[in-house]
Each structure stands twice: as C-alpha cells, then as structure tokens.
C-alpha cells in the first residue's frame, strides 16, 4: 500500500502509519521472488510515471486526467538512495519500503563509493531461503478442517515429527512480520495420512482475516527460526484505511514532491509497494544503463521475461517485441517507462501486460530461431531460376526485422565486436520524437545513431558500405546475366541493353549475350564481339595491333581508339540516351580509323614501343577488368609500336545505314590483312567447324587489322557476297589465329589477359555470364597453342561455357625484357557439360605473384614456377604445332628435340597439327563422333578424345556449385616435367624428376599455430575430428556439434562457412578449402552476424595452396 511522499525523510515508524521494521528475509519472501531493493548509498533511477501507476493500482482506479502536469519534472530522475527501510502494514501485513532519495545533477560528480555501490547493486544476489508457500483453499480457511501441508514441504521446513508417538504430533511456533508469535499443533494423521496444522490455525485465519485465494508462507531464516507471512490476493477493497489519502491527492503529492526535489536537489521520500506495483519504478542505475544503452532493439526481436507463478514460483515466458513508443506521449514524453509493446507466445493463467520496460525483459540476442542455425547446415543446391541475391541469414534478418532496410541487417566490417543490429532504447525514443510525425518509421538517415563503437564509423549516406557481413553480401547478382552489379549500375545496364539490335561499335559490342545460332561456314565475317554490361570499354589500337579492352566503370561508356601518327585525339562517348546513334557513330568511326590506318601504314611496324603504352597499361591495371581482347601481328623483325590516340565524337549523327556501314568497314579492312600460311588456314578451318553455335542471333561487326581476336562465340553474320581471301583472318565464332608468333589465351566467361605493357595480372574476377543455370551450349571450344619466342609463357585452360571468350594476347616484343607481372592461371569453366580442354602458353616470371583466385564465374589455379619446374601426370600426346609457323617465321628459335620438352598438360605444343592426337589430350571429350564429319581432311583424326579420360585435378579446385558435376577429382599428385617448357629457348635437356607433391588443408584455431593436414589420409569425419582435436589439445570437445562448445567448420570454394560433418565425406573432400576451430565465443559471433569480418581466415590460402603457392610439400 502506497503513501504520499513528503518532503522529508520521515521517521522509521512510517509517519503515523504504525508500520514496523520487519525481518529482511521474511519481507523479501512476502514481497515476491522477483523483488530486489537497491542497496543504501547507491545510485538509482526514479520514474515518477511508475510511481503514479502504483498509486492508481493501490486505489484500484486509473490516474485522474485532472491531475496537473509538471512540465519541469523529467520522466526520470537519477538519485542517490540515502536510506531504505523495509516495512509492513499492521492491518493488512502488506510489505512495502520507504526510500529517501536525492536527485543528482551530474553522475560524474558522485564519489567513488556511490558509483561502486551502484555497480555492486547489479551483481548482488540474495541468498535463497527455504520457504513453503500455499494458496489457501476453502477448506483451509474453515474453522474445523485445519491447514493441510504438503508432505515434502512439511519434511523440509517443519521440525521432524516423533513417529514413535501415535499419532505423530508436535507443537510449532512461528513469528509473523510484526514479530508476533503464533502457535500451531502439527499432526500427521488421516486416511490417507497427511500433515495438518490444527490447534491455533483457526485463530490465525480469523486474526489475519484470511480468505480463500490468499497465500500463507513459512520460511526458515539463517537462525533456523520459523517465520510466518501472508500474501493477500488482489481484490477490490471494501474499505480503505483512514491513513490512506485519496487517489488524486496521492498523485499530486508524489508529483509535487518529485518536482520540488528535482528543482532544488533536495531529499524526498517515496514508498514502494512491491505487491501493488505493476513494475519497479526505482531501478539501480547500473541495471538501467545496461538495459537501455547496452541492448540493441529491433521490432520482431525475441525476449524472455520472468513471472511469478503460484506458490511463489517463477517461470520465464517468451514473447516478441512488436512496437516501441511512449506509453503516455502527452504527459511523459520520451519516457522509458513501459515503452515496449510485446506479444506473448502462449497464454498464461494470470493476465500479463502488453507493455513492459526494457530492464524487465531479457532480449534474446542470439539467433532468431529456436532450431540449429542454418549457417552450419549442409549446403543444398539452389533451385533453377532462383536468385542468390540474399543469403539465408539475410532472409532471416529481413523477416525478423521488416521495419528496417536491408542495410541495417549488416555488420560493420571495421568493428570486430559488433553485436546484434538494431538501436538501443534511447535511440529509439530520440528518433521517434525527432521526427515530425508521431510513430514515423525509422528512416535510413537516422540509423547512424547506433550506440557504442560502431557509431564512430557509420555514415548515414553510405550504410551499404559501412554496415555489412562481407562485401560480397552487398552485391546484388543480376538474374539474367549472373553478374555482380552495384545498385547504381542497374539502370544503366538496362539502357545499354537496348542498343543491341544494331550492328556494333568498332571493336566493342555492347550486347547482353544470350545464346548463339549456327553460322554458315561459307559466310566468314570479321567478327569481334565483346559483352559489356554497364561497363566502360577502352579500345586501344596501336597499329598494327588491335587491343580491345572492356573495363567496368561508371557513369558513362567511353570509347577510346589509339592509332599511329599524327597524334589525333578525339573522344567518343556513347550516351545512354542515344542508343540508336551509338552504333552508327562507332561504325563510322571505325571506317575513319581504317582509312587513317591505310594512309599511315607503311613504316609503322618498325617503330619503337613508347613508354606511353607501358604507362597506359599500368593505369588499366587499376580498373576492374570485365573483358580484354589483345592481338598483335609480328613479322620476323622486332616490332615496336608507337600508339597515337584517335577518338571519335559519340554525339555525331550519321545517316549511313548499319548494314552499309558494316560492308564498307569490311571492305576497308581487306587490304590490311597479311598473308597467312597454309597451316594457319587449316587451323582456322578446323576451329570454325568444331565450334557449333546454337543460340539466338545477334548482330556483330568485326574490326580486324592483320590479326583479329574473338571474345564471344555467340554471333550472327550478315550475308555477304565477298569471297574470303586466303590472307583474311576470320572465323565463324571469331576465333582468329594471328599470322605470327602470338599467345592465345582462352578464358571462361570474361576473364582478361593483360599483356601489353607487361604489368597486368591474369586473374579471374566476377564477370558477366549470360546464364544462371548450366549452359546448354554444345559448342566445344578448341584451343590451339601457338609457340612464341618469348621466354615467358602463359598457360590457361578453358572449356565450353555459356560465353566462350578467346583472348588474343600478342607478343609485342621479342628480345626486350620479359613480362613480369602477368599471372599464370588455369581457368576452370562454369558448366556441367565440358571440362578444361587444353593448355596454353602462360607468361610469368614472378613466382611471388602466384596465388589462388576464385570467383563466381570460374576457378583459377595459379601454378608456381619458383622451382623452375612443374610436375603433372597428364599423358603425352603428339599434338604438334611447331610447324604451323615454320613458313611465317623462318628464323624461329624453336627446335623440337624431344616431344616431352614442349609438353603442356601432356600436350606437345610444338608438334605438327597433322599428326594424330593422343586420346588423353583433353580433359573433356569435345571431339567425338558428333564432329567427325565436320572436320576437314586429316584434321578428323587430330581431335579424337576418349570420353573415359578425365584428368586428375585437385580435389579442391571446383565445387559442384560451379556446375561441373561430372568431373572426377583426385589428388594432384602429378608428374609433368615442364623445365623445357619454362626454358624453351635454352634448348636444355629435360630436368630430373622431382618429388611427387600432395594436397593439404590448413587448420586454424585462434590463439594457436595453424596446422596442415592431408584430407586424403582420413576415412571419415570421426578420424578427422579426433586428429584435429589431438593437434590442438581439445580432445573430446569436438564430438557433439549440436551443443554449445567448440565447433569445427570449413570454408568451401564459394567462401561459405559450413559445419564439418553435415555433408557426405566425399563431397566434403572435394570442396573443402580450409578448416577452422571455432571457440564458443566465435560461434556466437558467427551466429549473430554471419561473418568474422577480416578476422576469419585473413589472407589465408586454402587447400592445395600456401599463401598463393600451390602444391607445396608440407607436413604436420
């Protein structure tokens, strides 16, 4: 029962109420198991709004609206608790507490003892007292039945009976709250026998005026004294004590006292009735701070809340936060008192409030689901046509918190200890009242009010960059093209896609590639197609080489053409709003460039390569390449080219029809073509017959200058009556062989090989692909490796893809310094129908640059050349190509002394084309009976490969998510001796056999040195876990993955973190990249935010690699 708070401290007798101090243990037992008073001398937070609710609950009526408001009274007061006294009402035995408070203007000015007491208040625990509580029944309150005590309670609380007596009985004495002694006779009798309190019980019931529904409790204190208390059921009182003021007077009294004390920093007294109050309104300061500023709230968040049950028990009920708003926005604005709206999971016998205060609940900050986290479940294949824009955790967060945008469900990468995303209570209330409209939904610009450490790094204008699981989560994959596009590119990509129906620009086609149609082999066109989606192509044309580069850059598409002297600079900028003009402009620009080339051609081939070209390639390296096509033609003499910038004005209007412009361009190109040897023509015929296009027609234009390269096999050709001359470089798919020493690099999707300038890294990045499902294109891409006099060779393998791209990488110089930074890479195609086909020359003189690089489109494996040799057990073959260039390069340094000296994945790249191929040439059978009748002459026998041949690749190179479901993966123990391949010009003999190499997988544990293990040594998960636990000294703690503790997870090729043991062992061996042992804290962080940021495997290599140096011999 509450009383008004006067301005003074008052006496201990409760200001005329006759209350007495009571036993502390009995007071807490009567108050309830959830009640806890802050210690004297500590800081507390006082809520006048809650105090007013207690008055209304005591009077069984709501607060009168006529009560005056006190605008100068804040919704909460931080005070020092000078004194606290536990009291009990002499009439009703209801317990309450009297507290003397004094407001504090500045918490930092409090002495250390006060702050320490506040901290201790949060940690203090009250010792559990043995007690027994029972709700009285009608028979218990009758005058003749006595009080029945449950057997276990009687044996635990009451003294032992003397069972030698018949019936067993004893006399009990118990003291009440007011230190009155009550005597009862305890007897064990009845049928069945039970413990009863008989004599003296009726006196106690009548004296306390107990009714059915009230509760009686017995406890034993620290002195083993038996204490007796009562709890009255909440019922409408028939009369009120004369000492109790009217409801309005009490409301005015407590508010006036609090306002006066806040204005003058004076002491005031309040009374707290735990049985009448709906919630505690005097909260320890540390508890308040932790609840309001330490918890991140979000709508839909789950929570627990403790409730008192019958007979003084407790139980947690689960609920969901449905809203955060002021309980009384008029009188108590921005108040934290019961400002959380909740919905409960289940019904309860007692009525539960729909509004609670934050310090009353326990937010569930770890996972939003009851069942095991999907982060650690086995991977399942995505259904066809389903977008992978969001991860499972993204979906869970969005469903749980639909009130915020996608950005807030992320984690700040710079903050390693970020907690569950959301806003704390103070931020919620500030946002609501800073908005012009009440109840306004959270706006993105307000999210920068996140508390704690993240607030220093968040920018409201760039939340998508600041708050994230991982950068790859922020990328939205375009469904049609399966390419990662930033949101700003989506609109531009749609506009660029409208340019397609017209013939395309010089050296560049902005086409959303789909599929290809069969092209008539008799209609050979000069075709260069390059899919560019929302990107910026830079077309560099040093004469006589043509370099077409595709760069991803916003906000506009710029076409730059570099030609020879005179240095004319004209920039052609393709405007998105003029799609119909772009094609005309580029075609016309192509004609003008060709005419300029014809005028300046004669003496260009003998000029020097300037530093400008080298510098320009260094700048190109800084951009994100989508596709680059490079081609050069070299005569026997050293070719060094002087580039000149020639550009076109994209805004030029042209009246020339697309078809006519194309024909003129083709005619202009014809005089520029050099003679091609018979071997090259044979190879050309062979390639264009092997490649069988099967997709929708697209219009393309080819710009060639002595040598042209294709970057896309999906083309349609315009009819022409021109007879193809022997000196023209052409192919149905655009696969064109240069007439002299050149490196051909074929890569999957849109990989790029930067050769000009020698400064580009060959790596695979996220690139456009025209299919989101395994390709049905049945075009096998045949790769021919042409030897080059350069000492540095490039090696790539490719297969049939939805977009096959051929990069003609020129060897610009013969005897100048070798290229230093071009990556040696093996590209693995993203299809289920064709496996890596052949090898090619790779340029790499810098073993420190080797590393493993994976992407969503292809997997590239870089082979280290640090030891000067590689070994791989691909069978040898007699695929000779050395004589291809014998006529065109009479002074070539190549001399075949041993077929194995020029092996590349078991392929003799210096052999003659006409000799039969070994059946094990290709990793995939691309030349079966399907193409037998299409190959001319003896070329039929050159491309027969067995379907049974599947080369042994690394078990960690490809996962099934790349669509290569039928490829066999074993160890990478290999035996290819490529010392002559790496040193071809030295004419040295083959090096000695090297030690066989094996795979290994790194295992990491925070705070311990990483270990490496051979996955193939183990037969199953149990053996693996036992060995890993032994290595790191955690034996027996990796067994049960469903309980909290150490977890063994691994990362696959898509960089997904999965639980070890969920997938079949064979699948695990194929796709594991690295293994990590998670501590319980790391597991919790993983469950909360789905990512470790930069702390999870930072810059770590994976299976079959060590910091970018694959296939290195290691041991445990």
Curated annotation (Swiss-Prot):
Biological process, per Gene Ontology: auxin-activated signaling pathway; regulation of DNA-templated transcription
Molecular function terms, GO-annotated: DNA binding
UniProt induction comment: By auxin under dark condition. Down-regulated by auxin under light condition.
Biased composition (Low complexity): 768-780
Positions of the UniProt region annotated as Disordered: 763-812
Family to which this protein belongs: Belongs to the ARF family.
Name under which the protein is recorded: Auxin response factor 21
Species name: Oryza sativa subsp. japonica
Classification of source organism: Eukaryota, Viridiplantae, Streptophyta, Embryophyta, Tracheophyta
Gene from which this protein is expressed: ARF21
């Amino acid at each position: 029962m509450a009383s008004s708070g006067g301005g003074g401290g008052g006496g201990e007798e409760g200001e005329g109420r006759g209350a007495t101090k009571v036993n502390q243990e009995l007071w807490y037992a009567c108050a309830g198991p959830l009640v806890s008073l802050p210690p004297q001398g500590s800081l507390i937070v006082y809520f006048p709004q809650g105090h007013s609710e207690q008055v209304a609950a005591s009077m069984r009526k709501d607060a009168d609206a006529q009560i005056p408001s006190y605008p100068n009274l804040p919704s909460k007061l931080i005070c020092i608790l000078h004194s606290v006294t536990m009291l009990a009402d002499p009439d009703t035995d209801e317990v309450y507490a009297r507290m003397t408070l004094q407001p504090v203007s500045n918490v930092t000015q409090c002495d250390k003892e006060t702050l320490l007491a506040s901290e201790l208040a949060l940690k203090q625990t009250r010792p559990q007292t043995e007690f027994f509580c029972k709700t009285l029944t009608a028979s218990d309150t009758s005058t003749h039945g006595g009080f029945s005590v449950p057997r276990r309670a009687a044996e635990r609380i009451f003294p032992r009976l003397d069972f030698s007596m018949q019936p067993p009985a004893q006399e009990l004495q118990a003291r009440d709250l007011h230190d009155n002694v009550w005597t009862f006779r305890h007897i064990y009798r009845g049928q069945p026998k039970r413990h009863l309190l008989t004599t003296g019980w009726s006196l106690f019931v009548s004296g306390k005026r107990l009714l059915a529904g009230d509760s009686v409790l017995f406890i034993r204190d620290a002195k083993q004294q038996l204490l007796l208390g009562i709890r009255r059921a909440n019922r409408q009182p028939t009369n009120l004590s004369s000492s109790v003021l009217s409801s309005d007077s009490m409301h005015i009294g407590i508010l006036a006292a609090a306002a006066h004390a806040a204005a003058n920093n004076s002491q005031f007294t309040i009374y707290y009735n735990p049985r009448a109050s709906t919630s505690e309104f005097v909260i320890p300061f540390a508890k308040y701070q932790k609840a309001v500023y330490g918890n991140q709230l979000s709508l839909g968040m789950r929570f627990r809340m403790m409730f008192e049950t019958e007979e003084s028990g407790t139980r947690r009920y689960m609920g969901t936060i449905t809203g955060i708003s002021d309980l009384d926005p008029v009188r108590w604005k921005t108040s934290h008192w019961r400002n959380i709206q909740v919905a409960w999971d289940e019904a309860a016998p007692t009525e539960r409030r729909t509004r609670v205060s934050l310090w009353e609940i326990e937010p569930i900050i770890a996972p939003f689901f009851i069942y095991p986290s999907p982060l650690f479940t086995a991977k399942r294949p995505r259904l066809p046509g389903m977008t992978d824009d969001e991860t499972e955790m993204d979906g869970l967060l969005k469903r749980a918190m639909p009130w915020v945008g996608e950005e807030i469900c992320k984690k700040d990468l710079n903050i390693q200890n970020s907690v569950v995303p959301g806003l704390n209570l103070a931020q919620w209330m500030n946002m609501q009242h800073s908005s012009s409209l009440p109840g306004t939904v959270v706006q993105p610009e307000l999210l920068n009010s996140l508390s704690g450490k993240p607030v220093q790094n968040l920018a409201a204008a760039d939340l998508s960059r600041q708050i994230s699981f991982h950068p790859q989560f922020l990328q939205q994959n375009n469904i049609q093209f399966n390419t990662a596009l930033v949101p700003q590119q989506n609109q531009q990509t749609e506009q660029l896609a409208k340019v397609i129906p017209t013939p395309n620009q010089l050296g560049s086609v902005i086409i959303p590639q789909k599929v290809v149609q069969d092209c008539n082999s008799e209609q050979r066109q000069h075709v260069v197609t390059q899919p560019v989606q929302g990107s910026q192509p830079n077309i560099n044309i040093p004469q006589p080489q043509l370099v077409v580069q595709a760069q991803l850059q916003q906000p506009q598409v710029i076409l730059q053409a570099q030609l020879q002297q005179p240095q004319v600079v004209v920039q052609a900028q393709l405007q998105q709003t003029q799609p119909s003009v772009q094609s005309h402009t580029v075609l016309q620009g192509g004609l003008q460039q060709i005419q300029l080339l014809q005028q300046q051609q004669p003496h260009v081939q003998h000029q020097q390569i300037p530093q400008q070209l080298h510098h320009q390639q260094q700048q190109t390296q800084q951009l994100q390449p989508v596709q680059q096509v490079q081609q050069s033609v070299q005569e026997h003499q050293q070719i060094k080219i002087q580039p000149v910038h020639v550009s076109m004005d994209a805004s030029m209007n042209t009246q020339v029809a697309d078809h006519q412009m194309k024909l003129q361009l083709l005619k202009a190109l014809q005089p520029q073509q050099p003679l091609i040897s018979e071997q090259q023509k044979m190879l050309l015929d062979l390639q264009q017959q092997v490649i069988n296009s099967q997709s929708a027609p697209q219009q393309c234009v080819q710009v060639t200058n002595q040598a042209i390269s294709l970057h896309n096999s999906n083309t349609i050709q315009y009819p022409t009556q021109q007879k193809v001359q022997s000196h023209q470089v052409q192919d149905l798919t655009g696969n064109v062989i240069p007439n002299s020493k050149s490196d051909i690099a074929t890569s999957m999707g849109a990989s790029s090989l930067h050769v000009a300038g020698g400064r580009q890294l060959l790596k695979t990045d996220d690139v456009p692909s025209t299919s989101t499902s395994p390709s049905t294109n049945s075009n096998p891409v045949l790769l021919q490796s042409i030897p080059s006099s350069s000492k540095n060779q490039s090696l790539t393998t490719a297969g049939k893809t939805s977009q096959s791209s051929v990069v003609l990488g020129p060897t610009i110089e013969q005897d100048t310094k070798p290229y230093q930074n071009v990556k040696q890479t093996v590209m693995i195609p993203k299809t289920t129908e064709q496996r890596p086909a052949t090898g090619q020359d790779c340029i790499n003189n810098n073993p420190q640059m080797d590393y493993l690089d994976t992407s969503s489109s292809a997997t590239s494996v870089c082979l280290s050349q640090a030891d000067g040799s590689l070994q791989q057990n691909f069978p040898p073959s007699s695929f000779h190509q050395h004589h291809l260039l014998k006529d065109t390069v009479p002074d070539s340094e190549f001399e075949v002394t041993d077929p194995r000296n020029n092996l590349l994945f078991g392929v003799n790249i210096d052999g003659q084309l006409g000799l039969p191929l070994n059946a094990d040439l290709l990793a995939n059978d691309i030349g079966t009976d399907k193409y037998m009748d299409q190959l001319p002459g003896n070329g039929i026998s050159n491309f027969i490969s067995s379907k049974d041949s599947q080369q042994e690749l690394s078990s960690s190179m490809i996962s099934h998510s790349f669509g290569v479901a039928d490829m066999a993966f074993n160890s990478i123990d290999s035996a290819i001796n490529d010392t002559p391949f790496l040193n071809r010009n030295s004419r040295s003999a083959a090096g000695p056999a090297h030690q066989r190499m094996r795979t290994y997988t790194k295992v990491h544990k925070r705070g311990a040195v990483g270990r490496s293990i051979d996955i193939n040594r183990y037969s199953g998960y149990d053996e693996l876990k036992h060995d890993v636990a032994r290595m790191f000294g955690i034996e027996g703690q990796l067994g049960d993955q469903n309980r909290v503790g150490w977890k063994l997870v691994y990362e696959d090729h898509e960089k997904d973190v999965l639980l070890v043991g969920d997938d079949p062992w064979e699948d695990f061996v194929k796709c594991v990249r690295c293994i990590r042992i998670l501590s319980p804290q790391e597991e919790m962080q993983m469950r909360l935010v789905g990512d470790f940021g930069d702390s999870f495997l930072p810059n770590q290599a994976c299976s079959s690699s060590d910091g970018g140096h694959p296939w290195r011999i290691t041991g445990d």
